Amino acid sequence: MPVSGQLASKDTSAQKNTIALLGTYHFNNPNQDQFNVNSDDVLSAKRQKEIAQVTATLAAYKPSHIALEFNANDTAMDARYQRYLKGQHTLNNSELEQIGFRLAKMLGHPHVYPVDAPSIQLDFNPGELAGEYGYLLEQLGKTGDSIMTQINDRMKKYTIGQILANLNAPAMDKLNVELYYKYLLPIGKSDNQPGPEAVTRWYKRNLLVLHHIMKLAEGKNNQRILVIFGQGHTAMLKQFLSYVSDFRVVNIQQFLPAN
């Protein structure tokens, strides 16, 4: 019997590898990004209770691998996790350890998996462009600062679970990626294009991250990968993964606490 004029295909969704992307702010205030959240003390009793709740709800995803924002070629992260398993390391205040290590131990994982690529530095000084393109850089600064202010305000009122749920909303992903197209991509002329070059380098880093993530499931089926990364990365990774049919992306919000 014909099926709407289309060839019927076998449903392989059950064999697909699954990815959940948890976009975070940096709990430990490393100030390594252009725009940074002023995180409060995640080691306080209140925040520790909230982190435990986030970890418990994330456990329902049942990840087979936990991928973290740490250089993929550096063994220090997993070595630290091994010490943590042996009771020889106290969790620091980064989201990688507070959520990543804690969850991995809860689930009995023998390893955690760093998948980041080295940050690719720009070869131009934004200050040099202040004259002709100052209006774009000014708008970028104002927009970025406004986003950080909103997150900082939410931090005073909401739990970590609620903050993460907001960060991982589609509207936040769109706002994040839009910054690159709206304020950086237009910068430059035919013989000098620092804006497109900056966007290209950001894309390259995130494509390398995706490469490392994909390697975790290479040649396997039914893997369930949880990626814990800065929200600026996960917004772009979701975009890339929409074109990778071998992976099914699940909405992380269903695995975050409701309050």
Regions flagged by a language model, labelled:
Residues 26-28, 72-75, 118-122, 231-234:
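Solvent-exposed loop/turn segments at secondary-structure junctions
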Residues 26-47:
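Acidic/histidine-rich helix-loop elements
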Residues 43-55, 85:
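N-terminal post-signal-peptidase region of extra-cytosolic proteins
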Residues 51-60, 73-81:
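Post-signal peptide N-terminal segment of secreted/secretory-pathway proteins
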Residues 62-68:
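Proline-aspartate-enriched helix->loop->beta-strand connector
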Residues 80-217:
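Hydrophobic, often amphipathic alpha-helical segments used for membrane interaction and targeting
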Residues 199-259:
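A cross-kingdom marker for long, charged
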